[in-house]
């Protein structure tokens, strides 16, 4: 007997998690996972950061540790420390009390809160401009709340570099007051970031058109190994822009606590006016969706950010991860050059962060998976964190084979 839900359309599985499922099911011993964005150590294993281990020990030794509900706004110490790490201790937004912050379910949850806030309260535009390409989930997050999406130029496929001219042109051509999502650092999927000089031009163009900037910061400290450097674009935006600034912050990657869903949403206002009203609306969003955010991860990150010795250890952990990833970029580039693989592979070392936008097309990616058990996202994005000294030569030879034996046309 049929029922009222019998006609619901079945959707295809999520591309990234579908890729992971195929990898897990693959019995070939030489398989390599360059798909999902999670750090791996030199042995290809998940790495619990030393700073996280010590913070976990300290919070469990605290007699006051418990599993009580957090306030709707989140763990206060975490929310405050998270704002300072991304905006800077001396941020005028913090000192002038014109910042509204709330704990979220990592970066995706923060983007969801931002999207909900925009859809309800931003009347100038309901279109979010996303870089071309961008993280695939951006589209779902915004469109699920009724917002429209459009794109702006970012990646030049021919030169494997940033299309800054097209980027600025699209900012200028967008209707005044449009919403622009900006990757703060370690752009996903390209790994290619604007220079500081280019960021100044981008921010000036946004200011001239009175656009609403929305920064997505998922990799602070993970891109360059330096927290301040990776937050530079956001802090410069706070300095020069006159519109509100929305910031979505994740601690999944940079503390390696992917499954704990630790994040924050920050709204920098031009003046402190109406802060209590805005916070009250954000609290209703949280209360109606998850009641209050999870405590454990927030307490770990708070302990790291507010304990000088742990914060210093965390900074070293970030250097360890970023340097290992960069070393694998160099190794892969050098091996491809040594093999004489057709094409120019310098873009691999010019990119930063977890990912490399390899330039491989869908046919080549499919052949890597079927013939060599090397798993990449169909766009050609590779998680460099999945490379190590034991598999990088195998991966280079696999790439060499598919480039030589498939079409170079997309």
What spans do the regions from the language model cover?
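Conserved core of the PLP fold type I
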Residues: 58-59, 64-209, 220-222, 228-240, ...
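N-terminal "arm"/small-domain region of PLP-dependent enzymes with the aminotransferase-like
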Residues: 2-74, 81-84, 288, 294, ...
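Hydrophobic beta-strand scaffold residues
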Residues: 34, 149, 213-214, 245, ...
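Short Gly/Ser/Thr- and Asp/Glu-enriched loop/turn motifs at secondary-structure junctions
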Residues: 97-98, 348-353, 377-380
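Basic/polar N-terminal segments that are highly enriched at the extreme N-terminus
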Residues: 1-4, 406-410
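Conserved PLP-binding catalytic core of the aspartate aminotransferase-like
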Residues: 313-371
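Conserved core segment of the aminotransferase class I/II
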Residues: 239-316
């Amino acid at each position: 007997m049929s029922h009222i839900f019998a006609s619901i359309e079945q959707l295809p599985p999520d591309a990234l998690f579908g890729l992971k499922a195929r990898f897990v099911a693959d019995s070939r011993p030489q398989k390599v996972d360059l798909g999902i964005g999670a750090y791996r150590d030199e042995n290809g294993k998940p790495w619990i950061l030393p700073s996280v281990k010590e913070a976990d020990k300290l919070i469990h030794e605290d007699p006051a540790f418990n599993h009580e509900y957090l306030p709707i706004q989140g763990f206060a110490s975490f929310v405050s420390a998270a704002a300072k790490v991304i905006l800077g201790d001396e941020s005028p937004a913090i000192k002038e009390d014109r910042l509204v912050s709330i704990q979220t379910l990592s970066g995706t949850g923060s983007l969801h809160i931002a999207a909900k806030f925009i859809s309800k309260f931003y009347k100038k535009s309901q279109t979010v401009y996303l870089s071309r390409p961008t993280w695939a989930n951006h589209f779902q997050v915004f469109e699920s709340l009724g917002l429209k999406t459009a794109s702006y130029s970012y990646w030049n496929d021919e030169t494997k570099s940033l299309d800054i001219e097209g980027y600025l042109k699209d900012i200028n051509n967008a209707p005044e007051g449009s919403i622009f999502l900006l990757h703060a650092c370690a752009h996903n999927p390209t790994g290619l970031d604007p220079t500081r000089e280019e960021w100044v031009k981008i921010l000036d163009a946004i200011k001239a058109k009175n656009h609403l900037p929305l920064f997505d910061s998922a990799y602070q400290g993970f891109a360059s190994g330096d927290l301040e450097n990776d937050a530079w674009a956001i802090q410069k935006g706070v300095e020069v822009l006159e519109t509100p600034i929305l910031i979505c912050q994740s601690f999944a990657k940079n503390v390696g606590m992917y499954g704990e869903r630790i994040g924050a949403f920050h709204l920098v206002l031009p003046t402190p006016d109406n802060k209590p009203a805005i916070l009250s609306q954000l609290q209703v969003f949280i209360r109606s969706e998850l009641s209050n955010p999870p405590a454990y991860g927030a307490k770990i990150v708070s302990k790291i950010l507010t304990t000088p010795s742990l914060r210093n250890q965390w900074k070293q952990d970030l250097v360890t991860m970023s340097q290992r990833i960069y070393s694998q970029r160099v190794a892969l580039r050098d091996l491809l050059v040594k093999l004489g693989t057709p094409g120019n592979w310098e873009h691999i070392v010019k990119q930063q962060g977890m990912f490399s936008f390899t330039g491989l097309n869908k046919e080549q990616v499919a052949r890597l998976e079927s013939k060599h058990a090397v798993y990449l996202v169909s766009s050609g994005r590779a998680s460099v964190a999945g490379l190590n000294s034991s598999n990088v030569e195998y991966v280079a030879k696999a790439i060499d084979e598919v480039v030589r034996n498939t079409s170079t046309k997309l």
